[in-house]
From Swiss-Prot:
SUPFAM superfamilies xrefs: Pectin lyase-like (SSF51126)
Gene name per UniProt: rgxC
Disulfide-bonded cysteines: 231-248, 379-385, 409-423
Name under which the protein is recorded: Putative galacturan 1,4-alpha-galacturonidase C
Catalytically driven reaction(s): [(1->4)-alpha-D-galacturonosyl](n) + H2O = alpha-D-galacturonate + [(1->4)-alpha-D-galacturonosyl](n-1)
Role description: Specific in hydrolyzing the terminal glycosidic bond of polygalacturonic acid and oligogalacturonates.
UniProt lineage: Eukaryota, Fungi, Dikarya, Ascomycota, Pezizomycotina
Organism of origin: Neosartorya fischeri (strain ATCC 1020 / DSM 3700 / CBS 544.65 / FGSC A1164 / JCM 1740 / NRRL 181 / WB 181) (Aspergillus fischerianus)
Primary residence: secreted
InterPro entries associated with the record: Glyco_hydro_28, Pectin_lyas_fold, Pectin_lyase_fold/virulence
GO cellular component annotations of the record: extracellular region
Length: 423
């Protein structure tokens, strides 16, 4: 799937045309302009028509003065298309329909409400309905509002996702993609202070960052996230990921992982994350930058994300990862590695993932974890991690602390960790 994005000034302008909700097609130029129905009437039939008629070598326009109501699911197949997406999309608040009719995703038992690609996008996921209904206990069926699935040569700019029910912006099988000026906000208006009702609302990610998975050659610049889970997650089989200028407000920081949850290669290689601000919000900011892999055996799980099935035992390499220039304001923890996800107490140090050539460089600020230990490295007895570098990681264990924090390490190769006091 190839996309050619051009600026608004070069698009034909349909000034003076009036619509009662529908699709206006310029046959000569293969351009479809979609007008919203209004009054919370489902706009999906018109969207489907536009994607069908102009989704192959054409242009689809969603004017900026339009508000679209997304009542049903959609997965158009597009080719060589330009999407000028200025209007606002709001997903319906029909929770029963969404739980039972979204597209299933095998990874962590999730679902997707809408799969497409576009440019200049504002999506309102109507997530507060979900946050209030579940009150911090995620249930199966919450849909991701937006997924790039099986795409290549994609450029996305000025993209805003408001109140996503689940992961905000995801890549599943994507190659050569560039994202710039992306904003994701998941804020519960009903949650009591100090309570996180917006868990699993990850920002950007490679699911296959923002979630990424099966993603190659991905660039993300100028990204802002406010929410209650991973700001950016880089998941299995993500390669050549470059991320710069990020602000994470609340949640769980920048994650590589989780990896190894399933019996498959879960490698991640060649990642740079640079110039990041980590800001505590609503007493919620768990990590700053971390790598997490599952234990090396199938372990019974009870959470909905595992669909009640045992998980773990995946393999692969996590290597050539650089986290640099982080300003940490009150996260519970500094940079860390944890290879014991999914452990029930009997499988510590059993991960089959090999972690190596990791650099945490130029971290400043303070943590709020209530301990002098600001960084932990817990790897694998099966494949002890090595070449883990802490270079100018200067974090204080509290806003008013006078001494720098220390670290702790286990299941690492002899001399495998450098620059972390206590290891």
């Amino acid at each position: 799937m190839r996309f050619s994005i051009i600026s608004l000034v070069s698009l034909p302008l349909f000034l003076g045309l009036t619509y009662a909700g529908g699709v206006e097609k310029d046959e000569r130029n293969n351009v479809c302009t979609v007008k919203a129905n209004g009054k919370q009437k489902d706009d999906m039939p018109n969207l489907f028509k536009a994607f069908k008629e102009c989704g192959n070598g054409g242009t689809i326009i969603f004017p900026e003065d339009q508000s679209y109501w997304i009542g049903t699911r959609l997965n158009p197949l597009l080719n060589d298309v330009t999407v000028q997406w200025r209007g606002k999309w709001t997903f319906s608040d029909n929770l029963d329909y969404r739980r039972n009719n979204s597209f299933p995703v095998a990874f962590q038992n999730h679902r997707v409400g809408f799969i497409i690609s576009g440019h200049n996008v504002t999506i309102d996921g109507n997530g507060n309905t979900w946050y209030t209904a579940e009150k911090g206990v995620t249930q199966s069926g919450r849909p991701m509002p937006f997924v790039f699935w099986n795409v290549s040569e994609v450029n996305v700019e000025n993209f805003y996702v408001k109140d996503p029910p689940l992961w905000s912006l995801n890549i599943m099988n994507g190659t050569n993609m560039r994202f710039n000026n992306i904003y994701c906000n998941a804020t519960s208006v009903d949650a009591p202070y100090g309570y996180n009702w917006v868990q699993n609302t990850d920002g950007f990610g490679s699911f296959s960052a923002v979630n990424t998975m099966d993603a190659v050659n991905i660039q993300l610049t100028n990204f802002v996230y406010q929410g209650g889970d991973d700001c950016i997650t880089i998941k299995p089989r993500s390669y050549n990921i470059d991320i710069q200028n990020v602000t994470c407000v609340g949640g769980n920081g920048i994650a590589v992982g989780s990896l190894g949850q399933y019996l498959e290669d879960s490698s991640v290689e060649n990642v740079r994350v640079d110039k990041v601000k980590i800001i505590r919000y609503n007493e919620d900011m768990h990590n700053s930058a971390y790598i997490k892999t599952w234990v090396g055996a199938l372990v019974p799980q009870s959470s909905y994300e595992s669909a009640g099935l045992p998980c773990g035992g995946g393999w692969g390499n996590v290597r050539n990862i650089l986290f640099s220039n982080f300003e940490v304001q009150g996260a519970n923890a500094g940079p860390s590695v944890n290879q014991d996800s999914g452990n029930n107490g009997s499988y510590s140090g059993s991960s089959l993932m090999t972690v190596s050539n990791i650099v945490f460089a130029n971290f400043t600020g303070y943590t709020s974890g209530g301990t002098s230990v600001t960084s932990k490295v817990s790897c694998s007895e099966v494949h002890p991690c090595y070449n883990i570098e802490f270079d100018d990681v200067l974090l204080y264990p509290g806003k008013n602390a006078s001494n720098l924090g220390t670290g702790s390490c286990k299941y690492t190769a002899n001399g495998g960790v450098h620059g972390l006091e206590g290891c």
